[in-house]
Amino acid sequence: MSTNQILHCETAKRLLDEFGHAIQAVLLLHEQQFQSIVEGDSDAGRFDLLIHEALELKQNAKYAYLNHLDSHNCSY
C-alpha cells in the first residue's frame, strides 16, 4: 500500500469519526428534548432549531465521508 493510500484511509477514518460524532450529537439532542417533554417542560420546542442544525452537520459529515470514499476509492 502506498503512502498516498494510507493517507486516504486515515482521512476516511477521520471523516467517519466526524460522522459518528455528528450522529451522537443528534441523538443527544433528541434524548434531551424527550426528557424535557417527559418532565413537562412547556418550552421543549427550543430543541427544534438545535436539532435542525445538528442534522445539517450530520448530513455534511455523511457526504464528506461518502464523497471521499468515492473520489479516492478507499475505505475504512
Label every PLM stretch briefly.
Residues 26, 50-74:
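Amphipathic alpha-helical coiled-coil segments
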Residues 25-34:
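A short, structured beta-strand/loop element
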Residues 2-24:
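Short, charge/polar-rich alpha-helical segments
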Residues 4, 38-43, 65-76:
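Long amphipathic alpha-helical coiled-coil segments
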Residues 13-16, 43-56:
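Short, charged, amphipathic alpha-helical segments
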Residues 2, 34, 41, 45-49:
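General secondary-structure edge motif
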